[in-house]
């Protein structure tokens, strides 16, 4: 019984039909726990214990042999053909152009017009929409000004998002889906004169990457 666990909403009718015609059973993503919990004694389950979530590991029955190995599909998925490599390059050139225009716009206009964490995310989206083949964001944009830049996966609340001023840092962690491929680009912009502490910490963070 071959099957996949997936959120059904991400499958088009064509993909669903092709999978079913190939004998692949489509199961709801959350059903994986019950599936593993009901594995028969003496069966085997391969999982990478370094990355599998603890909930899934915990429901494996005592009579099931766990084979601790890296997912064998990882390496083939990582191998890209020439067309894929070229498309990634094109997607990143497009995204780089949009982010560069955004960076210039922010630095020219900060302190002159009203900006906050949400409005600058919308502006970057506007620049991305100018690029041919743009589809949509590849994930929810993260724009963190000042101390908010240190919050992992920060999401600016509409009622209290920070106003940008010509000082401190703006962390921009965003991405895009283009017809050629997807991107994820993170940059930190100095919006004005920095304090001595900000300079010191920025250098300390950058040095290990050299």
Region roles according to the model:
Residues 1-210:
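Active-site neighborhoods and metal-handling regions in enzymes and metal-associated proteins
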């Amino acid at each position: 019984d071959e099957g996949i666990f997936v959120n059904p909403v991400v499958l088009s009718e064509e993909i669903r039909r092709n999978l079913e015609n190939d004998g692949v059973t489509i199961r709801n993503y959350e059903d994986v726990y019950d599936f593993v919990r009901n594995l028969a004694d003496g069966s085997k389950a391969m999982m990478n214990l370094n990355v599998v979530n603890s909930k899934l590991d915990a429901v494996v029955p005592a009579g099931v042999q766990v084979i601790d190995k890296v997912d064998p599909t990882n390496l083939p998925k990582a191998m890209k053909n020439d067309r894929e490599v070229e498309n990634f390059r094109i997607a990143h050139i497009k995204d780089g152009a949009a982010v560069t225009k955004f960076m210039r716009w922010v630095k020219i206009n900060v302190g002159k017009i009203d900006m906050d964490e949400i409005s600058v995310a919308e502006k970057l989206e506007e620049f991305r929409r100018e690029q041919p083949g743009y589809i949509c964001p590849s994930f929810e944009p993260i724009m963190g000004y000042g101390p908010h830049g240190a919050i992992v996966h920060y999401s600016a609340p509409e009622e209290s998002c920070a106003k940008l001023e010509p000082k401190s840092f703006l962390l921009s962690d965003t991405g895009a889906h283009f017809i050629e491929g997807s991107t994820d680009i993170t940059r930190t912009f100095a919006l004005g004169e920095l304090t001595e502490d900000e300079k010191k910490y920025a250098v300390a963070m950058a040095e290990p990457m050299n």
